A protein has these predicted regions:
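Two-component/phosphorelay signaling modules centered on CheY-like receiver
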Residues: 21-40
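Acidic catalytic/metal-coordinating carboxylates
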Residues: 44, 70-73
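Non-catalytic signal-transmission and effector/linker regions of two-component phosphorelay proteins
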Residues: 1-16, 118-156
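Short amphipathic alpha-helix used as the core "switch/output" element in two-component signaling
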Residues: 50, 72-84
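Acidic, metal-coordinating helix/loop segments flanking the phosphotransfer/catalytic sites
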Residues: 41-59
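Active-site residues of response regulator receiver
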Residues: 63, 91
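Residue-level signal for the "D+5" position in two-component response regulator receiver
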Residues: 41, 66-69
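Alpha4 helix (beta4-alpha4-beta5 surface) of REC/receiver domains from two-component response regulators
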Residues: 73, 94-112, 122, 126
């Protein structure tokens, strides 16, 4: 993030995807690019940290299970390098993350894998709008699990 002539935060990319599965990373990237977002992807936590330092993304989508670092460690380091980056952690197992952990690391929310692309895009666009306006990620919600619905069945 840098400051423009009026002192407003500017970002070099919209979304950084941190996902070690190239197929999943490409699927997410293609879907988000259709919403006209600038998207970069990395395959490890250490590469993500290097990329954040260079690009200052508005939003980071972080897989919890990476080959070198876990998603919480990556989020902690991103928060130190780029406090304006909003973060979403994705995992096949959400029971590992407590609200306390999320609050302490600045993770906005977490999503269960496989990720539903529509709700993910909505969350990303909301975070980008808020981050672009203020230069900071939005306040952390009290409830971090995004609601899911399947037909008439709904989880909130």
């Amino acid at each position: 993030m840098s400051l423009d002539d009026q002192g407003v935060a500017s970002f070099l990319t919209d979304v950084l995807i941190v996902e070690d599965d190239p197929t999943q990373a490409e699927e997410l990237a293609c879907y988000l690019r259709r919403a006209r977002l600038r998207v970069e992807a990395t395959v490890s936590g250490s590469l993500a940290i290097h990329t954040v330092a260079r690009l200052r993304p508005k939003v980071a989508l972080i897989d919890y299970n990476l080959p070198d670092l876990d998603g919480v460690t990556v989020a902690e380091r991103i928060k130190r390098l780029s406090p304006g980056t909003a973060m979403i952690v994705m995992s096949g197992r959400i029971d590992r993350l407590s609200d306390h952990t999320l609050a302490n690391t600045g993770i906005f929310t977490f999503m269960n894998k496989p990720v539903a692309l529509g709700p993910l895009r909505s969350a990303v666009l909301t975070l980008i709008r808020t981050t672009t306006r203020t230069g900071l990620p939005p306040p952390l919600p009290k409830k971090r699990l995004l609601p899911l619905s399947f037909g008439s069945f709904s989880l909130t």
